[in-house]
Every structure is written in C-alpha cells, then in structure tokens.
Amino acid sequence: MQTYTLGNPACNFAPGTLDSVQKPARVLIAASMSLVAVFAMTGCAPDRGPFPVPASSDSDTPVVETPTPTPTPTFNKQLFSVDDPASIWVVVDKLRPLNPQNYAAPDLVSLPVINANPSKLRQEASDALVVMFNAYTAETGLKMASQSAYRSYAAQVSIYNSNVGRLGQVGADLASARGGFSEHQTGLALDIAASPANCTLNQCFADTPQGQWLAANSWQYGWILRYPNGYTDITGYQFEPWHYRYIGVLASTEYHLEGATTLEGFFELPPAVDYAG
C-alpha cells in the first residue's frame, strides 16, 4: 500500500482507506481531508524553519554628519601700524620715539568741549571725545573738561625741561616725556579733568566721579587709560589716571576683552622702563 506523505508525519494516510468506510463516515472524512489540505499549507507543510532576516548593510544606517565648528575670528593686530606716527595705533614710549621726532600731527581741530587750556586733537579723536563727554554728562549730570591735548615738539621740550628743574631728571622722566617721545605730540592723547576742577593732574583724580567713570567706560568710545597704576615697570611712567589715549573703538574693545593694561602688552612690545640712550 502506498502512503501519501505530507510534511508532518501526523498527517499521512494510505490510499483506499476511504473506500472501506461507510458513506456517512466518508462525508466526515472528506471534510477532514479539506482540513488536511489546510494543514498541508500550514502546520503540515514541510518544515522550512524561520524566514531569513536580511542582514543590514552600512548603507542602510543614516549618516550623521558632525558640523565643522566655525573658527573664532582672530583680532588682527597688524591692521594698522604701531610705528607710523600718523596711525591711530602708533605706540610711543621711551624706546619708541616718533619718527621724525619733530612730527606734527595732521588734521588737528579745536576741541568743542570745556577746555581748561586751548586744546586740539586729530579730527577722529575729537569726535570720539565729544561723544564720550556727552555720554558721561547724560548719565551722571556731571561734566568733564580737557586739561591738555596736542603738544608740539617744542612745547614738549619746554615742559620736560621745566620738570627737570623742579623734580630732577629722574623725577622728570617718571612724570613727563622728552620731546619726540610724547603721545601728546600725536594728537591722540588727552589729559582729562573734572569740571569744576577736582584733583586736576593728581592721582586722586582716580577717586573722583569722572575718574571712576572713565576707568570703567572709556573703552566703549575708543579711549584707554594709558598709564595705569602699578605698571611703571612697563610704561616707564607713574600712575596718571587723567591721561587717556585714543586708539579707536575696534582696538579699545579688543583691549577691554583681553583685559589688557598697557599698549606694550597688547601689541607684544618690550617694556619701556627707561630711554635707550
């Protein structure tokens, strides 16, 4: 006898089996055979195991790109010359005289502010000073004045010689510059006073409302305190809380952000404690 074999042994049967069964039973068996066919497609189908799962490929994995960080802009300290006497970044100290030493600043204008003495500055510095003085008055109701601004070579020689007579050469070298070595000769430096006068050209000016405001805010207008307290071993001069230097808002902002204290340090120049000769 031939046996019909399905994938599952439990579903196998032999031919002729139905002929020996009574009709009613055959009907039941026929119905059962229909179920067998279903089983053949399901439970009685040949064992094939689970369907294989396709292996994932690297190309199916989303690629996450790491953004390239934007480099922090570097302040260009070579944008303007520190040697050219006409540059607003010129650095003048005991090792860096003006060239020529009798240099006369261009585009000088009379300062349209309160003046203790007739004062002039270069146009750009003058404009910035007016804005700064007006901002101070608007904020505090108080006033500032120009004590001394541009000085010619001859005027600086006269002032220095006068100080030598009063203070001796060592004292004069701490208190004033020799002719050809003064920032005042650039038309970019200013001695500032309170108005009415209070601690004029004295270190106590640092404690006045004007002196305190300037120390905190002058950088916003392009000005810096040139000879700060405790830096004589770099600048060569005693503390002068009244002496401010214009370098422009671009440089003064960077100067402030870096926490710089002297132009020598800011521009990585050597200390200028004394004259070379």
Please describe what each predicted stretch is.
Residues 2-5, 13, 26, 41-149, ...:
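Extracytoplasmic cell-surface/polysaccharide-interacting catalytic and binding patches
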Residues 10-11, 15-31:
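Bacterial N-terminal signal peptides that target proteins for export
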Residues 31-40:
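Bacterial N-terminal signal peptides
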